[in-house]
Amino acid sequence: MTYPERKAFVSRITNETKIQIAISLHGGHISIPNSILDRPESDVAKQATGSQIIDIQTGIGFLDHMIHALAKHSGWSLIVECIGDLHIDDHHTTEDWGFGSRTGFKEALGHVRGVRRFGTGFAPLDEALSRAVVDLSNRPFAVIDLGLKREKIGDLSCEMIPHFLESFAEAARVTLHVDCLRGFNDHHRSESAFKALAVAIREAISSNGTNDVPSTKGVLM
């Protein structure tokens, strides 16, 4: 089956943040027309292969790391540029990136047709193991249990990690369950959760071999 072009570009400017996001759910070439960055903050979350382009610049290293993992294992191409009020804290940057990513995902996905709709993913990272289940249901709901104990990982507040996932489910209008089943290192617990979510999303948006809406209602989103 030939996929529709599932791409989107989102620009969001507020008094707190400036964000630009380009996304393609099936990888390939993407670009941002006019960069808002004077220069890249870091090359840590930057990767270009024959099938994906990923460049994440939020100013928060651990957030960049998590977004990079999500994009890589979802099969997305993703460019994120963000200038946030980090002199205050990480809240607005994380929240507004989340808003932009959710908007971009929903816009790129478009009508839910010809896809599996449901996705399940497991991902280990050393001692940590996480599970994610996704339903492209148009019924936003999230149950998140990561069991994080630290206040921060790098410069990212741990309370913002489940908040981002809950907000993603609400704005993207998906049902989302993400659990870290075991693990004692909060970095590993978080990263395995984002990777499990990526695996689940990749399955949910993959072709089911038809052009049908995967619902007894005949419509989703």
Swiss-Prot record:
Biological-process GO terms, alphabetical: L-histidine biosynthetic process
Similarity comment: Belongs to the imidazoleglycerol-phosphate dehydratase family.
InterPro entries: IGPD_sf, ImidazoleglycerolP_deHydtase, ImidazoleglycerP_deHydtase_CS, Ribosomal_Su5_D2-typ_SF
Pathway: Amino-acid biosynthesis; L-histidine biosynthesis; L-histidine from 5-phospho-alpha-D-ribose 1-diphosphate: step 6/9
Keywords: Amino-acid biosynthesis, Histidine biosynthesis, Lyase
EC class of the enzyme, as a word: lyase
PROSITE patterns listed in its UniProt record: IGP_DEHYDRATASE_2
Molecular function, one GO term: imidazoleglycerol-phosphate dehydratase activity
Organism the protein comes from: Kluyveromyces marxianus
Intrachain disulfide bonds: none
Enzyme Commission number(s) from the entry: 4.2.1.19
Domain of life: Eukaryota
The reaction(s) this protein catalyses: D-erythro-1-(imidazol-4-yl)glycerol 3-phosphate = 3-(imidazol-4-yl)-2-oxopropyl phosphate + H2O
SUPFAM superfamilies referenced in this protein's UniProt entry, alphabetically: Ribosomal protein S5 domain 2-like (SSF54211)
Pfam name, any one: IGPD
Protein name: Imidazoleglycerol-phosphate dehydratase
